[in-house]
Amino acid sequence: MFSRASVVGLSACAVQPQWIQVRNMATLKDITRRLKSIKNIQKITKSMKMVAAAKYARAERELKPARVYGTGSLALYEKADIKAPEDKKKHLIIGVSSDRGLCGAIHSSVAKQMKNEVAALTAAGKEVMIVGVGEKIKGILYRTHSDQFLVSFKDVGRKPPTFGDASVIALELLNSGYEFDEGSIIFNQFKSVISYKTEEKPIFSLNTIATAETMSIYDDIDADVLQNYQEYNLANLIYYSLKESTTSEQSARMTAMDNASKNASDMIDKLTLTFNRTRQAVITKELIEIISGAAALD
């Protein structure tokens, strides 16, 4: 009764909805898998935000008394206006970061300023050596400045920094054998929960301080006293920079994890909407097939 072409055409029409249904079912499985994955990630980011918030609260409390160390140590340099002579060539740059990531551009901002400083000093004919406090700063700079690395320190940022940690770093620098004339410490200075600023503070060697012209206004300064002051001053500045950097890092991580959690919520909402639309399309197609089949039987 029917031609061969008609039968083939009918078979093709009958098979096509099945392929569409299989494709939609596969899409639903993919969406379900993605939703589950994103929800798990969101749980992690929310937990990390809570941990960072607790660490930030402690770091901010400890930062206020630590700032006294920094301002006190810089007072002599500012009052006496100590500067290294232009003919002094050896310069030391200390970059303060940590071993942990997921905190925005905290580490890259310090690395960027260090690169700019190294380039400027090298162009001026200075001999520049780098000290990295934290694995992150070493990971960023070591590939391009490996020949300028004097020493690096790890296990930074896992626990709140103490003055003992700063003293160990200062002692290691003084015993490194590199007799620098002047230098700088580059770190992130905490401003508020949502902002920080990359700062640079000066440091000077014992010889530079002792031979500075402005030091003549101070009478009867014993050499041992001046040496003790210079060593203590270096530890103070490192401690201050560690505290500022830690507070900035925890606040940045808290903000980054909060943004990640919000982005995950947006993705979950969009995927849920897509899932519902796809499921509704599958149900509609199945109903059409049932109705069409029932109508054909009638």
From Swiss-Prot:
The UniProt record lists the keyword Hydrolase: no
Residues recorded as bearing N6-acetyllysine in the entry: K39, K55, K115, K138, K154, K197
Gene3D superfamilies: 3.40.1380.10, ATP synthase, gamma subunit, helix hairpin domain
Organism name: Mus musculus
Domain of life: Eukaryota
GO biological process: proton motive force-driven mitochondrial ATP synthesis
Record protein name field: ATP synthase F(1) complex subunit gamma, mitochondrial
Bilayer disposition of the protein: Peripheral membrane protein
